[in-house]
Regions:
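Loop-to-helix "switch" segment enriched in basic
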Residues: 194
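P-loop/Walker A NTP-binding region and its immediately flanking N-terminal helices
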Residues: 1-150, 158-160, 168-176, 184-190
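Inter-helical turn/loop segments and adjacent helix faces that build the functional surface
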Residues: 163
Length: 194
């Protein structure tokens, strides 16, 4: 089975990031807990977390809080507390879909974040579901939709790398249909090419 292009062409460095995210390279100079948020998927939140980890040569532990297993207090107590108590300061704990954590789990995170060895990066689509306490302890970065020109540029790069011939109007349609969600636009391009 062919690799998804969204994964194959996922940026590995700040220079490869699309849109405003590439301006965030200063984050590696003074690492802190981060809360990355947007009003939609495919904006680069998770990718930014992985780029930061790679640039700092930190281990990254990724958890998706949208599953029943990882959104409750048991997950915080059984997984996160031991992980952040390990003494490894060169690690990032990425909680994707952090807005799906239960209020109890978010409350339990309070002590974990305060005493963590390493750094938390929380990514979410609905910041209103994240507790005020977490918001106050993290640098908040809002991700805007990826601009149409930046999307086109990235899709054109992928077309060149994959040998895909596409018209300007077809490329435009893909960008317009996916309104700032680069991941879905790349998936649509791959479907078009196959």
């Amino acid at each position: 089975m062919e690799q998804l292009w969204a994964n194959k062409y996922r940026p590995q460095t700040f220079d490869e990031l699309v849109g405003g995210a590439k301006e965030l390279d200063y984050l590696t100079q003074s690492m802190q807990h981060l809360l990355l948020h947007s009003r939609g998927a495919g904006r680069g939140k998770t990718t930014l977390a992985h780029v930061i980890a790679k640039e700092l040569d930190y281990t990254i532990h990724t958890f998706n809080a949208s599953s029943k297993k990882t959104r409750g207090i048991a997950f915080v107590e059984e997984e996160l507390i031991p992980l952040t108590s390990s003494g490894n300061r060169n690690q990032i704990i990425l909680l994707d879909e952090a807005d799906q954590l239960t209020p109890e789990a978010q409350s339990a995170l309070k002590g974990v974040i305060e005493n963590a060895h390493g750094y938390f990066i929380l990514a979410c689509n609905d910041i209103s579901k994240v507790s005020d306490w977490i918001k106050s302890r993290c640098l908040q970065i809002h991700f805007l939709p990826i601009g149409k020109e930046a999307m086109k540029e990235r899709l054109e790069y992928i077309c060149g790398a994959e040998g895909v011939v596409i018209t300007y109007s077809q490329l435009n349609l893909i960008c317009e249909a996916h309104e700032g969600d680069l991941r879905n636009a790349i998936n649509a391009l791959q479907a078009f090419a196959s």
